[in-house]
From Swiss-Prot:
Disulfide bonds: none annotated. The active site is at C417. The keyword Glycoprotein does not apply. It comes from Bacillus cereus (strain ATCC 10987 / NRS 248). GO terms for biological process: rRNA base methylation. This is Uncharacterized RNA methyltransferase BCE_0542. SUPFAM superfamilies: Nucleic acid-binding proteins, S-adenosyl-L-methionine-dependent methyltransferases. PANTHER family: PTHR11061:SF45, RNA M5U METHYLTRANSFERASE (PTHR11061). S-adenosyl-L-methionine binds at Q292, Y321, D342, D390. [4Fe-4S] cluster binds at C80, C86, C89, C168. GO terms for molecular function: 4 iron, 4 sulfur cluster binding; metal ion binding; rRNA (uridine-C5-)-methyltransferase activity. Belongs to the class I-like SAM-binding methyltransferase superfamily. RNA M5U methyltransferase family.
Length: 459
């Protein structure tokens, strides 16, 4: 028996046949070899592949595809030339309609892990994009040199090798163009480029952001020090070659770190901010401001949150994890009052500014945690009808879930970017709430990410 058990264990470098059962949460194929779970990036459900083990972990193994014996009918040729090296997308080799089906399945699996019935009949089809390309409004590409040429891209996974990305197929065309213009000018002016291995040089990263609705573009150079040689010439060239660039910024980050931004940001030319609109709302975006990366699908996501809240105009709403106030402001016209909180004081300052600029008088924003503010407000006689949560990937704080169960608003609208933490939190809320439906939304086509809006109603 012991001998048999030993035989069934995989070893690094071993090749073996495997049938792919489903997609994992990171977009990898999941199969079983002699009852051991194996994660295989690039393999698709229903495929029969020959895989080679690359890593053994406790309870699972990782492998790579050596050969596809039987391909999925949904397998397509990834249009991006650096798709397999870059790692930014995980699902370009899967037909887009099937990506939407598989993302729903990822959500179903997450709920099955925490609940027996998995709520499958309540999980709706994923809302996708008509055109799932060139949707991202912001890029952060590292800068390097290759044979005297300036290149921009991302580091190959677990290496110092920079993959040259001349044209990213999920980036907005204007962000691609701005990056191309800037790298061309840096090369022409022979500006010093940071060398990651030697940790020497000046320009580290080019960050570009496009306001999709207004067409304004912002370029931020991340440098190791403040002095920028040929600064005036650089500015003049950028403005001449791409008039859409309305804001040229510089950020200084001298630390040996993979964190992009340093502490000091200042304007080189143009405006400090660019203007963007979402529906009827407009936002000022500074170099470091958080803003949703896919504005088109953000409108879809927020409209789903609005539908789930089912507002009549009389509701008091709490917007927990409110950030710069976007979801709350999206609902404010149809609510009696919106109160939001966030642990980041700068975000609260922006939320107040955004509310004021739009003329809202029924909003209130406080720095701190929802689990601190909510009991205080209830004590003062202010009780919410709807609580909207849009937490980070780790999900809601346990104390917030306990507070929601104590305060018992009529409805909870849960906006999530991580199906695993969503399913865990929803299970906790089901002590007092019933799930009416789960609506997956595809915010990032060709990646494994899936957002969800869940409507929970008090029992």
């Amino acid at each position: 028996m012991i001998q048999k058990q030993h035989e069934s264990k995989l070893e690094v470098g071993q090749t073996f046949p495997v049938t792919i059962k489903r997609l994992g949460i990171n977009g990898e194929g999941v199969g079983y070899f002699k009852r051991q779970v194996v994660f295989i990036p690039g393999a698709l459900p229903g495929e029969e592949v020959v895989a080679e083990t690359t890593k053994i972990q406790r309870g699972f193994a990782e492998a790579k595809v050596k050969k596809v014996r039987k391909a999925s009918p949904h397998r397509v040729k990834a249009p991006c030339p650096v798709y397999e090296e870059c790692g930014g997308c995980q699902l370009q080799h899967l037909d887009y309609k099937e990506q939407l089906n598989q993302k729903r399945d990822i959500v179903v699996q997450a709920f099955q892990k925490y609940m027996n019935n998995g709520l499958e009949e309540k999980i709706r089809p994923t809302l996708g994009m008509e055109n799932p390309w060139h949707y991202r409004n912001k890029s952060q590409l590292q800068v390097g040199r290759k044979d005297e040429k300036v290149i921009t891209g991302l580091y190959k996974q677990n290496s110092h090798q920079l993959i040259d990305i001349a044209h990213c197929m999920i980036q907005h065309k204007a962000t691609n163009e701005a990056t191309k213009v800037v790298r061309r000018i840096l090369e022409k002016l022979n500006v010093s480029i940071y060398n990651e291995k030697k940790q020497k040089g000046l320009v580290r990263t080019i960050v570009t952001r496009t306001a999709v609705q207004t067409g304004e573009v912002q370029v931020t150079l991340i440098t190791t020090k403040e002095e920028l040689p040929n600064k005036e010439q650089f500015i003049a060239e950028v403005q001449k070659q791409m008039p859409a660039v309305k804001s040229i910024m510089q950020n200084v980050n001298w630390r040996k770190t993979s964190v992009i931004f340093g502490d000091k940001t200042f304007k080189l030319a143009g405006k400090e901010v660019i203007q963007e609109t979402l529906g009827d709302l407009s936002f000022e975006l500074s170099a470091r401001a958080f803003f949703q990366l896919n504005p088109e699908q953000t409108v879809v996501l927020y409209n789903e949150a609005k539908k789930a809240a089912a507002l009549t105009g009389n509701e008091k709403i709490v917007d927990a994890y409110c950030g710069v106030g976007t979801i709350g402001l999206w609902l404010a016209n149809d609510a009696a009052e919106v109160r939001g909180m966030d642990v980041i004081p700068e975000a609260i300052a922006d939320a107040r500014k955004n509310a004021k600029r739009h003329g809202f008088t029924n909003t209130k924003y406080e720095a701190g945690k929802a689990e601190q503010w909510l009991p205080k407000w209830v004590k003062e006689g202010w009780r919410p009808d709807v609580i909207v949560v849009d937490p980070p990937r780790t999900g809601c704080d346990d104390k917030l879930l306990e507070t929601i169960l104590k305060v018992k608003p009529k409805q909870v609208v849960y906006v999530s970017c991580n199906p695993s933490s969503l399913a865990r939190d929803v299970q906790a809320l089901m002590k007092s709430y019933e799930v009416e439906y789960v609506q997956p939304v595809d915010m990032f086509p060709h990646t494994a990410h899936v957002e969800n809006v869940v409507k929970l109603v008090r029992k």
